[in-house]
Amino acid sequence: MDSIAQLRKNYTFGQLSETEVPHHPLPLFQLWFDQAVKAECPEPNSMTLATADKAGNPSARIVLLKGADQNGFTFFTNYESQKGQDLAVRPQAALLFHWHELERQVRIKGLVERVSATESDEYFHSRPPASRIGAWASPQSAAIPNREFLEEAEKRFKSEFGEAPPRPEHWGGYRLRPTEMEFWQGRPSRLHDRIHYKLDGSNWKVTRLAP
């Protein structure tokens, strides 16, 4: 651990100019995401989701992006989990994508809402049966006595539902509607490129931030 302070890297992969980016952040996100896929970045749809509880205590965890369009960024989870409890009282969140191989980050802030039951059903039934059973078996974020508790619950719900488990009411999707997005491109000498989008009415204001 003594060598942590000495870990460093020079960023030389690319550059980003505020005069060349699109007026709306979504096309740039989609371009960067596609490039992350082509570069074979590990799990390019993995993102940090940061929430806060009623008292303002923050929590962060990795979740998977399952949709990105003009309506926002979609992910799915247990509504009774810590993140679900946080979003019930504070429906604001932040997302962070880090594509190390491309020396890029994307930060997103916005308001969060549940997706429709129809949309949750559609995604839930596209998942493998074992994952659908897992949504029933795990009381996410609750204290449990041991691993056997989960395994017994899994057996019980497999016996009850077979290969066609329905979506539990406590499981579904959220959509973050962005109000701010920042695109970060690593550059030499730590003089990184940071292009910031902020929603102003129905338009996006684009500015360059100091690194």
UniProtKB/Swiss-Prot annotation:
Catalytic activity: pyridoxamine 5'-phosphate + O2 + H2O = pyridoxal 5'-phosphate + H2O2 + NH4(+); pyridoxine 5'-phosphate + O2 = pyridoxal 5'-phosphate + H2O2
PROSITE patterns the record matches: PYRIDOX_OXIDASE (PS01064)
Highest taxon of source: Bacteria
Keyword annotations from UniProtKB, A to Z: Flavoprotein, FMN, Oxidoreductase, Pyridoxine biosynthesis
Pathway field: Cofactor metabolism; pyridoxal 5'-phosphate salvage; pyridoxal 5'-phosphate from pyridoxamine 5'-phosphate: step 1/1; Cofactor metabolism; pyridoxal 5'-phosphate salvage; pyridoxal 5'-phosphate from pyridoxine 5'-phosphate: step 1/1
Record function comment: Catalyzes the oxidation of either pyridoxine 5'-phosphate (PNP) or pyridoxamine 5'-phosphate (PMP) into pyridoxal 5'-phosphate (PLP).
Name of the protein: Pyridoxine/pyridoxamine 5'-phosphate oxidase
UniProt lineage: Bacteria, Pseudomonadati, Pseudomonadota, Betaproteobacteria, Burkholderiales
